[in-house]
Amino acid sequence: MARTEKIYIYGASGHGLVCEDVAKNMGYKECIFLDDFKGMKFESTLPKYDFFIAIGNNEIRKKIYQKISENGFKIVNLIHKSALISPSAIVEENAGILIMPYVVINAKAKIEKGVILNTSSVIEHECVIGEFSHVSVGAKCAGNVKIGKNCFLGINSCVLPNLSLADDSILGGGATLVKNQDEKGVFVGVPAKRM
């Protein structure tokens, strides 16, 4: 549910457009797009509307999140009404989390700040998705999976139950993780192997 009638969306690419759709689905009446340009400043005199960061790149999203937070803006979550979220799941409040249409988050899963859960992704029971990670369209984490911070799970990738993926790792599109990966890396294929 929208907290203000207007929302700032930082990022005006295709990802920004889908964030606008989710914001309007939540009841925001107007989305004000902001994007990079030389000398951009967040003035304290700007109206304090809700704020969302629509940047797909994890590292850039994290840096902008810190900058905007320091300037007193409230960074909200955008959660599409079609998402299915267990009452026992933990989604950090006011943490810049994006939950797209038809996402499923099951019992006692935890979603940390700055996470993107893209369309139709599935986060099963007791999973943890670390800060500023991005779970792409149709990606699935089976029960009790631990995804580190700043990770990227490619489109239609899959992580089998009880496995973990180290911080700053990438699981390629269509890949299936079948064993723990405790050191960061890029993993592709079925079964997923380090590149």
From Swiss-Prot:
Gene name tied to this protein: pglD
Q: What's a single GO BP term from this record?
A: protein N-linked glycosylation via asparagine
> Where does the source fall among the domains of life?
Bacteria
Active site, renumbered:
H125
What miscellaneous comment appears in this entry? Answer: N-linked protein glycosylation in C.jejuni consists in the transfer of a heptasaccharide (GalNAc-alpha1,4-GalNAc-alpha1,4-(Glcbeta1,3)-GalNAc-alpha1,4-GalNAc-alpha1,4-GalNAc-alpha1,3-bacillosamine) from a membrane-anchored undecaprenylpyrophosphate (Und-PP)-linked donor to the Asn side chain of proteins at the Asn-X-Ser/Thr motif.
Functionally, this protein is described as follows: Acetyltransferase that modifies the UDP-4-amino-sugar to form UDP-N,N'-diacetylbacillosamine in the N-linked protein glycosylation pathway.
At which positions is substrate bound? S13, G14, H15, D35, D36, G56
Quaternary structure per UniProt? Homotrimer.
Membrane-spanning parts: none
Q: What is this protein called?
A: UDP-N-acetylbacillosamine N-acetyltransferase
Q: Which UniProt keywords apply?
A: Acyltransferase, Transferase
Q: Which positions are annotated as binding acetyl-CoA?
A: H134, I155, G173
Note the site residues: Increases basicity of active site His: E126
Tell me which species this is from. Campylobacter jejuni subsp. jejuni serotype O:2 (strain ATCC 700819 / NCTC 11168)
